[in-house]
UniProtKB/Swiss-Prot annotation:
It catalyses: UDP-N-acetyl-alpha-D-muramoyl-L-alanine + D-glutamate + ATP = UDP-N-acetyl-alpha-D-muramoyl-L-alanyl-D-glutamate + ADP + phosphate + H(+). This is UDP-N-acetylmuramoylalanine--D-glutamate ligase. Cell wall formation. Catalyzes the addition of glutamate to the nucleotide precursor UDP-N-acetylmuramoyl-L-alanine (UMA). It comes from the Bacteria. One of its GO terms (biological process) is peptidoglycan biosynthetic process. The gene is murD. Gene3D superfamilies: Mur ligase, C-terminal domain, Mur-like, catalytic domain, NAD(P)-binding Rossmann-like Domain.
Length: 456
């Protein structure tokens, strides 16, 4: 694909936008980068882009006139309702995202993974499965490394494993991974998409351009995904915790099994997995199905599954202090993710929750709180909504606090040996932090400082 001399407006100066600028600069495009933030707010990265000769329009987005640009490339965090996008579409100027751009230069087969929850764990595990099997493997996408940064370094015999979000998928045009994986669908990002129907429509972009020789891996236990299977143009592979599957992965007699290439084959005992919770069992099943579909053996898969211990900020063990286990699940940015975290433990839980809600009801979360939580500590701009929902369920052991230092100290005072202190906010971090990672790192820092003080 020839981008020589193409006039491209890159919208959003985050990691994705910066990577796109550098990529297009190498292709000798004429690149303009715009962001509503100022040069000072963006920081040093913008200086480097300026030195490359990239035109900067900062502080506000520009108007787009007919014939002014050949293409707009969007960063995933930027809504498609902004003026330059509306104008570009009016003038038939193509609008695409970094994921679509990377795909157009991809040679290696892509395993793309989406879903409301579990994406990062499944993406990391799937990448590790292929690495351990000897493949040169790129793990990229919504997981922190823009695909466009590395995509040209991977060839036909290699593997690309990409975590893809609804924000990325809604700006695709031809994107068609060799294997598309959809883990689950529950309400999320409704503040951006407007409705559950639009959210599902965006997620479905992961498979709508696939060919009959491609594969889509779907959660059979998710009724919405089972229904979506009817509209997939590719070969459907299922995974399930609750049903025996003819073509895919499933549980039988506490064993992960695979089928579809002859009779069922055993992979590993579920008790040998080192990632806790039924949702992580689903993640393991999804990764297994994707890897098996592309030729990995049950033996190869079992070796990696038995070693994999999870990823940061997803039910991440932090410390055991005086018999109390502290767990960081800062990636639990919606109620469904937090519910899955609560379901992962049998011990009584001291739960720290709250942050910025994404327009989602906390009713089901509150029911699970009443069932699993002994003490609820709330904070953040919408912590009060969780408190109100819990009180409506008859749960009253609630302590609102102002910050994370107070939350951790209060949790220490309330927790008894054998209990779990769990940070699973059910909200985004954007009211108090730049990211869920920053939130999780602060929680870990506070817990480890407390552990150090307890040891004296």
């Amino acid at each position: 694909m020839n981008f020589l001399g193409k006039r491209v407006l890159v919208v959003g100066a985050g990691l994705s936008g910066q990577a796109v600028c550098k990529f297009l600069q190498e292709k000798q495009s004429v690149v303009t980068l715009t962001d509503t933030r100022t040069r000072e707010q963006i920081g040093q990265a913008i200086v480097q882009l300026s030195e490359l000769g990239i035109e900067l329009i900062l502080g506000e987005y520009p108007s787009v006139d007919k014939g002014q640009y050949d293409m707009l490339v969007m960063s995933p965090g930027v809504p498609l309702t902004i003026l330059p996008v509306v104008q570009a579409k009016k003038f038939d100027i193509p609008v695409l995202g970094e994921l679509e751009l990377a795909y157009r230069f991809a040679k290696a087969p892509i395993v793309a993974i989406t879903g409301t929850n579990g994406k990062t764990t499944t993406t990391t595990l799937t990448g590790q499965l292929f690495r351990d099997a000897g493949f040169k493997t790129l793990v990229a996408g919504n997981i922190g490394l823009p695909m466009v940064s590395e995509i040209e370094n991977y060839q036909v015999g290699d593997i690309v494993v990409a975590e893809v979000s609804s924000f990325q998928l809604e700006t695709t045009e031809y994107f068609a991974p060799k294997v598309a994986v959809m883990l689950n669908l529950t309400p999320d990002h409704l503040d951006r998409h407007g409705s559950m129907e639009e959210y599902i429509k965006a997620k479905s972009c992961i498979f709508i351009h696939q060919k009959p020789s491609d594969y889509v891996v779907l959660n059979y236990d998710d009724l919405a995904l089972r229904e979506l299977a009817k509209s997939c143009p590719s070969q459907v592979i299922f995974f399930s915790r609750q049903h025996i599957i003819e073509k895919g992965s499933f549980i039988q007699n506490d064993k992960i099994m695979v089928s579809g290439k002859g009779g069922p084959e055993e992979v590993i005992d579920v008790n040998a997995l080192r990632i806790p919770g039924p949702h992580n069992l689903e993640n393991a099943l999804a990764a297994t199905a994707a890897a098996y579909t592309l030729g990995l053996s049950p033996r190869d898969i079992a070796g990696t599954l038995g070693r994999f211990t999870g990823v940061a900020h997803r039910l991440e063990f932090v410390a055991n202090i005086n018999g109390v286990e502290y767990v960081n699940d800062s990636k639990g940015t919606n109620p469904d993710a937090a519910i899955k975290a609560l379901e992962s433990y049998d011990a009584p839980i001291i739960l720290i929750a709250g942050g910025k809600n994404k327009g989602i009801s906390f009713n089901d979360f509150a029911k699970k709180i009443k069932e699993k939580v002994r003490v609820l500590i709330t904070l953040g701009v919408h912590g009060y909504q969780i408190e109100e929902a819990a009180r409506e369920q008859g749960f009253t052991n609630i302590y609102p606090v102002e910050d994370y230092a107070q939350a951790v100290q209060l949790a220490r005072k309330q927790a008894k040996p054998g209990e779990i202190v769990l940070l699973s906010p059910a909200c985004t971090s954007w009211d108090m932090f730049k990211s869920f990672e920053e939130r999780g790192e602060l929680f870990k820092k506070l817990v480890l400082e407390m552990q150090k003080n307890e040891s004296f």
